[in-house]
């Protein structure tokens, strides 16, 4: 059974990101204000939330800085998993009906691996740079097909909505657990997106009210320099200001994280591979219950 999840501020040392990015930027002179709708803000934001833009601006640009206009680079890399393979999740498997058989590939194990032990669904964030980097797009997409979301982790910059679409012949009723939704709407087959609104930074869960095994972590942070790995374990984060920065990776399914400090130079592509370890015995001990069923490679 899905449980409603919201962790205010996404504490837990998440990504080592200093309270979701409040420490990501260093002070700059106060900028000239800009107008967003009818509201005057110190700098642009990208927001589709039905809330006062000043709330978003205060969170993502706490120091009221002008947008960063200096040189940038790109950080990319491969995230792999070491240690034990992912255990099966028998409760999830048992809840998947016969007409959703392919969903077992998404939810049948604790985490998803690709070729070469590439690790999917890892949140990667870059912090520690100087300057305010505005988000460029007001929404992130979450597509449903075959009774599964297209990822088990989504990361949003605060201000973005999560836009859910049905990409097959099924309707879906998305629910962002932890958000104060007024009503649940149906994403009709191959129709328009349903907009979900996280009202503050934090950790949420996306599910489908008709298929509660469809679960994905949704992390809402205060900076735009982030990505989520696909099944190949790879990520790309552009628009990173030059200088020393911290690259942090977190797998929400296990809460294992790793970080590394690197230096970004103008126009350069910085390769930052990271490995996240999984210890089956330690995981079983933290769960405080019986070990999950054995997993075959």
Label each residue range with its predicted role.
Residues 1-23:
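Sec-dependent bacterial lipoprotein signal peptides
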Residues 25-297:
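Extracytoplasmic copper-binding redox domains, predominantly the cupredoxin/blue-copper superfamily
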């Amino acid at each position: 059974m899905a449980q409603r999840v919201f962790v205010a501020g996404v504490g837990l040392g998440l990504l080592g990101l200093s309270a979701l990015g409040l420490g990501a930027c260093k002070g700059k002179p106060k900028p000239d204000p800009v107008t967003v709708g009818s509201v005057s803000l110190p700098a642009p934001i990208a927001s589709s939330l039905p809330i006062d833009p000043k709330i978003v601006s205060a969170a993502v640009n706490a120091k009221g800085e002008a947008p960063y206009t200096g040189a940038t680079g790109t950080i990319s890399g491969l995230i792999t998993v070491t240690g034990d393979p992912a255990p099966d999740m028998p409760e999830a498997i048992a809840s998947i009906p016969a007409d959703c058989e392919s969903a077992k590939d998404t939810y049948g194990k604790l985490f998803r691996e690709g070729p070469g032990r590439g690790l999917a669904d890892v949140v990667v964030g870059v912090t520690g740079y100087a300057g305010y980097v505005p988000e460029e797009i007001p929404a992130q997409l979450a597509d449903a097909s075959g009774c599964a979301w297209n990822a088990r982790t989504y990361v949003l910059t605060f201000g973005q909505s999560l836009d859910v679409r049905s990409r097959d012949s099924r309707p879906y009723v998305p629910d962002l657990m932890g958000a104060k939704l007024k009503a649940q709407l149906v994403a009709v087959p191959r129709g328009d997106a349903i907009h979900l609104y996280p009202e503050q930074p934090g950790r949420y869960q996306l599910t489908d009210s008709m298929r509660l095994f469809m679960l994905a972590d949704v992390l809402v942070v205060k900076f735009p320099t982030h990505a989520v790995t696909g099944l190949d374990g790879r990520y790309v984060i552009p628009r990173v200001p030059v200088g020393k920065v911290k690259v942090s990776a977190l797998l929400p399914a296990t809460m294992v994280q790793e970080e590394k400090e690197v230096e970004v130079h103008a126009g350069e592509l910085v390769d930052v591979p990271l490995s996240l370890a999984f210890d089956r015995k330690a995981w079983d001990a933290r769960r405080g219950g019986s070990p999950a069923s054995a997993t075959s490679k």
